[in-house]
Amino acid sequence: MATIDDVAKAAGVSTSTVSYVLSGKRPISAPTRARVERAIDKLGYRPHAGARALASSRTNVIALMAPLRVGVSVPVIMQFVAGVVTRARDFNHDVLLLTQDDVSGLDRVTGGSMVDALVMMDIEADDPRVPVAAAAKQPTVLIGLPQDPEGLSCVDLDFDAAGRLAVRHLVKAGHTDIALIGSPPEVLRRHTAFAERLMRGLRDQAKISGVTVKVEACDSTPTGASEAVDTLLATAPETTGIIVHNEGALPHVLARLAERGAVVGTDMSVVAVCPTDVALSQRIPMTSIDLPAEDIGKVAVDMVMARLESEQPSETRLLAPVLTERESSADGPAGPLD
């Protein structure tokens, strides 16, 4: 059976262009439309019922696209899922969980009458799913912030502000040599939006504060964490303040620092960006910037249901980061600033 990808390839256009031809939501030039329609006829492509006009009856189902890609923290993903599922039940809706990231799967779900609305996670800076979702008739809310949301509403932690807040905290404590042990290389190669936004905020604040910041990508494994710590201490041995933005690697980073003789909370200050339960489950309670994953999931459902009930302009909600100081904080060589 032909898919939207097959049509796009045959017509020499993007999948989003095919979606726009089907939905009529955006103007497409006559020659391009003709090529797409010829490809549809030649391949016998038939979208699921309702692709051109969503059935008026409700399915009481929300699709949640939460791709289980390499490098993601599944426990944290499940906190987002829990928030979406719990809040959806308040609206008498069930949740269809999609763990693949292919555009064809998105087209299959939005092209028919399977779901009333869609929530999408793990958003990349230039995410190929965004234009397809934007062309769909169902309302969609993104958990994440791409470079161009294309009219879709977004909700997330303000990771840019979180990066700035973490640096300000360490600078105020007297640290001038700071490092980020960040997301896995695969996450960075995909240009995942949350990781890039945190690094941007961190670097901007470091420049403003006049301090140095070294960034180390880190696999979420004991070996990956050990290699990141060893590389950091070899190339920047003067580092006294570390920000960890990698839930899976966090316990292994702390273990390797201990093996290397660094006492966290005394001669090394560590700030984690993670859910509070992750911060509290480490060998010592971690100073952390909370990632309120479950709350973000609930807000996403509130937003998408509001758009399902009535026409509303798109919006972006970025939750302000909150830092809680615990036992992993320590004063830096310069001493705390007044």
Each predicted region: which residue ranges?
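N-terminal helix-turn-helix DNA-binding module of bacterial transcription factors
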Residues: 1-60, 333-338
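Alpha-helical recognition/docking segments in bacterial nutrient-uptake
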Residues: 2, 61-168, 234
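Short acidic/polar active-site loop segments enriched in Thr and Asp
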Residues: 14, 60, 116, 176-177, ...
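Short beta-strand segments enriched in small/hydrophobic residues
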Residues: 17-20, 57-70, 177-187
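Glycine-rich phosphate-binding loop signature in dinucleotide/nucleotide-binding domains
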Residues: 43, 173-175, 232-238
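Hinge/beta->alpha junction and helix N-cap segments in small-molecule ligand-binding domains
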Residues: 67-75, 100-103, 155-165, 181-228, ...
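Flexible loop/turn connectors
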Residues: 226, 235-338
